[in-house]
Amino acid sequence: MASFHLDHLKNYHRRYCRSSRAPNIHTKKGQNMLEILQDCFEDQSKASFLDDFTESLTSSTQKKKANYSQSSSKKCPESHSKPVPVSSRTGEASLQASAEPSEAAGGSVQANEVHHGASDELDLCVGSPVVLLDANVNTLQKAASPAGQKRVASVSRSPVDRQASNKNISFKTRKRLNFEDKVTLSTAETENSVLQVEDNLSKGQEGTSSEITQKRDDLSSDVQSRSKKNFSELFLETVKRKSKSSSVVRHTAAVPFSPPPPSDMKLLEDEFIIDRSDRSFSSRLWVMIPSKDRHLSAHKPSPENTALLQGKKSREKSHSLSAMTFARNTQSDKAHPIEEAQLSVEENPATTCTDELENDCRSPENKMQSETAKTPPAWERTTKQSQRRVSKPKAAEELRKGQSSWENSNVSNTGQDKLQINSKRNMKDCEEVRNEPNPKKQKPALENKKKTNSTQTNKEKSGKKFFSGGSKNKFVPKKVTLTSRRSCRISQRPSEWWRVKSDESSVDRNPSKENNSPVVYPNKKKQTKRNHVSKRAGKKPGSSKRQKTEMSPRVQKSLNVKDSGGTVSGHDDTSRSQRKPLKIIEADPTQKSLAISRPKRGCKYRNNVMTSPNVHLKSHTEEYTSKTQMESASNSEMSKRSVWEESGPSRFKNYEMPGSSNSEMGDEQDQKSLHFTTRSFNMVPDKKLHHKLVLPSNSPNVRRSNRIRLKPLEYWRGERVDYQESSSGQLVLEIISPSSVPTKIKAQRNLGKVNKKVTKKPTHLNSHEKAKMELPLDMRLGDPFQATLAKDPETAELVPMDLIRPRDTYRFFVEQHGLKVFKTLDTIYFSTGKLVLGPYEEKGKQHVGQDILVFYVNFGDLLCTLHETPYKLTTGDSFYVPSGNHYNIKNLLNVESSLLFTQIKR
């Protein structure tokens, strides 16, 4: 009989498991799959096939003496795994780790028992390829007992099919077989399961303990927790019981068998595999018909993430998830398959919260899937021992809770879209909450940072805690509450960065006070940088990339995770690092710098006090208090010596400008003071000094330069700035400004040279012009170059004498350096002439003797010393030197000066 079914199965493969080049087979919605299968199974009808299957199932189950109930009392994390065909030649049994959809909190699922009879009527429908292939759910094998055959008239459909039908999701139907019964409600499944548990418990007491132990291992994988089975599974189980061979029939292309392909390897589109291994019933026959749908290996939501997402959905619906306390119960019928199978799927520790949220919000079918993870063999032994202690009311209660968890998992598409949008905003929130495995202990911020880097270790530890709790039949309630804000922007008071507090004692080091007082920063960039520095101090240096992502101040301010033991805030590390005040850098006594008082300035000076630029900023109230104290301290130390009176807008009254008046530090010698002193050859007015200095302007709330500026100095007069250092180490500024000589306004005069007439060209007048100017002369004129007849006084006779000396004719001429002496007339009684002095030339001191000298200043400014008295003479002045005296003449101009002299001889 088995060979007959295999032949028809080959025909089915040739007709429907076609290559990718064959056209697609389109089926209408609601069309019965039996109409299509009639061409495949020519002479075999559905009734005859099911009769054979029921017959074989009844014969195999009648050999067993008792039925046993299995229930899950252990929680375990589950993950998806792909079915991989394994040949018997390699000595490994083929296993398909099917994932069961569950609530985020994890609903408890009660295993149902196997009955002796088969269902009378089975309908086949086209199901979702995602549910039937990628999320191959474990189904509950139902065989009606003699007492309960009438109650089971049809196979109940699963909540996954019910959800798919309610949402009217159309899927691409391709070679997918499924049971269809869209009339039976989920409540009938619960009632039938409870009745079956009662019958099985009553019958299980009759069997011996040895048979119970032996049959439990054989039926651990056969008993399923769902109320339906795939057509391929029912068919292959029938073939399993008819033929006992350990060969593998592979109806596909002629290629050699290879090891199990990885999760990302693409198989043939229409590959059809039959595994008939008889190692144990746990590695049962299964058929894999892969499609081109994307693999779900990269989208494995973690149990923590699933719990968080379902918790958010329940808050949006205003429902309290009471079923979260019974999360992740391990199904008893899956214990043996997990023990023998070695799953190749490992949990990725680096899976980010974004991938998990995108995975869970992608489709309703992906939300309904649960995870299967690696479990050591000790877990299964503990599970088998705990299964023997399951009671009747416990099974009924878990069935009701499992049903309620399925009802809560039906979320509308609109809610899913909103959840997907909100999940992207709260990606950081999910990751930090996931790193807290124990809800009753408040973990410090540093410990939570370390657990972020070791996500995989935390998941395994949390999984072990859940399994150990399930073995003792204790359900530990775990309630996680998230308090997050949609808007991450937080309004802050406007920063007043120009206010600086110089008093070191005002920096409060009390952590309680510092936590309450806000820290004001100059701009937003500095605040982000300091947050990064504080976060790096509490984290390991290994994961720098993830630290930068988690250091965002928006996430730290918006996330507050509240546990039952306390509250953990993401802003805790930042506030702790900001509590440490910055060290005040004192001025170096060897470093010189110009400083002047700036009233009400916050950059470096305030009220004639020089402060350090690196001062820890405090709140506005403390700044105002410290400013008042600084003003009073600075006013008490002001000097009284006045240099400038009413000079400038600031009206400085101080001769010496003091440094920082820090009374507590008492280090006034280290602070440099600036002194303004003036030094002049003559007394310089105060306004003159103020005119040269440009002091800093008094402009509050505006950043200005604090240096002292000077107007251009008159360097050609010797005006300069002299910087000196006093004996006390203070810097002194000296301005050297010589007084200017006032110049006298002179009258405009013709200051021609003495020899100007000599060098001047004579003007020749016409005879006609001379006739008009001169009077007519009727006398005879003498010749000036000839001697003149004159009477001698001694003899009284006419004697020719030289009485006229024409121009440019001299009797005596002496030139020495810049001194020139011209004698025009020279007699025994007297002599006349002209004295010329060069620029700044001096004649020298000379004694007169018996003669008398008469001088007339023709041009220039002269310094004349008559005997012992000096005089300043100018053009037009006359003087004479009596006999027996001496005289001296000096030219005060840079030009030649001329004098006319007469010497009287005795």
From Swiss-Prot:
InterPro entries assigned: CENP-C/Mif2/cnp3, CENP-C_mid, CENP-C_N_dom, Mif2/CENP-C_cupin, RmlC-like_jellyroll, RmlC_Cupin_sf
Keyword Metal-binding carried by entry: no
Residue ranges, compositional bias (Polar residues): 56-74, 87-96, 202-212, 402-424, 481-494, 626-637
UniProt KW Phosphoprotein keyword: yes
Protein name: Centromere protein C
Organism: Mus musculus (Mouse)
Membership in a protein family: Belongs to the CENP-C/MIF2 family.
UniProt remark on domains: The MIF2 homology domain II targets centromeres and binds the alpha satellite DNA in vivo. The MIF2 homology domain III can induce CENPC dimerization/oligomerization.
Region (MIF2 homology domain II): 702-724
Functional description taken from the UniProt entry: Component of the CENPA-NAC (nucleosome-associated) complex, a complex that plays a central role in assembly of kinetochore proteins, mitotic progression and chromosome segregation. The CENPA-NAC complex recruits the CENPA-CAD (nucleosome distal) complex and may be involved in incorporation of newly synthesized CENPA into centromeres. CENPC recruits DNA methylation and DNMT3B to both centromeric and pericentromeric satellite repeats and regulates the histone code in these regions.
The protein's assembly and partners: Oligomer. Component of the CENPA-NAC complex, at least composed of CENPA, CENPC, CENPH, CENPM, CENPN, CENPT and CENPU. The CENPA-NAC complex interacts with the CENPA-CAD complex, composed of CENPI, CENPK, CENPL, CENPO, CENPP, CENPQ, CENPR and CENPS. Binds to DAXX. Interacts with DNMT3B. Interacts directly with CENPA. Identified in a centromere complex containing histones H2A, H2B and H4, and at least CENPA, CENPB, CENPC, CENPT, CENPN, HJURP, SUPT16H, SSRP1 and RSF1. Interacts with MEIKIN.
Motif Nuclear localization signal positions after renumbering to this chain: 228-242, 449-466, 525-540, 744-762
Chain spans, region Disordered: 56-115, 141-169, 197-224, 294-320, 341-596, 623-671
